[in-house]
Amino acid sequence: MSKVYVFDHPLIQHKLTYIRDKSTGTKEFRELVDEVAALMAFEITRDLPLQEVTVETPVGPATSKKIAGKKLGLVPILRAGLGMVDGILRMIPAAKVGHVGLYRDPETLQPVEYYVKLPTDVEERELIVIDPMLATGGSAVEAINCLKKRGATSIKLMCLIAAPEGVEVVKEAHPDVDIYLAALDEKLNEKGYIVPGLGDAGDRLFGTK
């Protein structure tokens, strides 16, 4: 069964307060999301395997460590997931970036894939699916489906804020995918928004309505 991790680092929680604040403007909101994504990347990579190597310093040889195992890949869900990519790349600059685009069918209300572009070696990478909000869980489940259909076997989900309903949907659909959050909020309202949440992450990132 998948595990859920909520990061309580003081810097993450401090910045998340300003992200939630409706008076925070687009520029500051964008910068804060970027910063929190970078901090979350630090936390989500704590379990990466290491191997010992020997390097030459200006003084002499040194035994040190470097990351081993699968290479990393980032997969933002369009469009709001894009706001978290640069912050993560600052921490993991060698990661390749794919994209998954989804829209909601007006009749069935189910997410439909309209764009998928992934690294050619997804089966050899540990992929981090990125979306600021995990509300109903439908988009996250479908994005993970897209990756698995193309051969991905090692996947994590990173979101700023989640509703319990969305977390349970993802856990049921993908029990092999761990979920990493900055906050787990109270519930969804009748419109499917996370309460208290932060509003529409995409609109606040890109200055749209």
From Swiss-Prot:
EC number: 2.4.2.9
Binding note for cofactor: Binds 1 Mg(2+) ion per subunit. The magnesium is bound as Mg-PRPP.
Pathway: Pyrimidine metabolism; UMP biosynthesis via salvage pathway; UMP from uracil: step 1/1
Disulphide bridges, residue numbers: none
Residues annotated as binding 5-phospho-alpha-D-ribose 1-diphosphate: 79, 104, 131-139, 200
CDD domains tied to this protein: PRTases_typeI
Cofactor: Mg(2+)
GO biological process, one term: uracil salvage
Cross-referenced Pfam families: UPRTase
Residue sites binding uracil per the record: 194, 199-201
Gene Ontology molecular function: GTP binding; magnesium ion binding; uracil phosphoribosyltransferase activity
Catalytic activity reported: UMP + diphosphate = 5-phospho-alpha-D-ribose 1-diphosphate + uracil
Functional summary from the UniProt entry: Catalyzes the conversion of uracil and 5-phospho-alpha-D-ribose 1-diphosphate (PRPP) to UMP and diphosphate.
Family: Belongs to the UPRTase family.
Protein name from the UniProt record: Uracil phosphoribosyltransferase
Lineage, opening ranks: Bacteria, Bacillati, Bacillota, Bacilli, Bacillales
Protein encoded by which gene: upp
